[in-house]
Structure formats: C-alpha cells, structure tokens
C-alpha cells in the first residue's frame, strides 16, 4: 500500500472539515472526484464509505444522508 492510500482517510476528513457544514455537503462522488483531482488517488464508493465509517468510529461526527 502506498503512502497516498494510507493518507486517504485523512484527506477525506480534511475535505469534510473544510468544505461542509449544516448547509453544505459533499456526495461520495464529489469526494472521489476531489481525491483523484487533488491527490491522484483513484478509489471506489465502497472505500470512501469505509473511510467515513472509520472516521466515525474515531469519534468524528459525520452526518450521512442516505
């Protein structure tokens, strides 16, 4: 596993922290697009979902809208 893949959950957390609030959200597709564009990380919907679940397990409050 390369360093970018290891950092992916942190990049997701950073995006959510900087770009979302009660009135603004990011979709998984938008997160995937930004990971590719900004960090050169190609990933799947399931992987991003797993990253979000892991961040929630750490106690980071992330609201998921189905």
Model feature map: region roles:
Residues 1-66:
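Short, basic/aromatic recognition patches that contact phosphate-bearing ligands
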């Amino acid at each position: 596993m390369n360093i970018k893949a290891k950092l992916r959950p942190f990049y997701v957390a950073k995006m959510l922290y900087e770009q979302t609030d009660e009135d603004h959200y990011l979709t998984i597709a938008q997160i995937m697009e930004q990971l590719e564009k900004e960090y050169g990380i190609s990933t799947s919907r399931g992987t991003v979902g797993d990253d979000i679940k892991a961040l929630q397990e750490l106690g980071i409050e992330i609201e998921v809208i189905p």
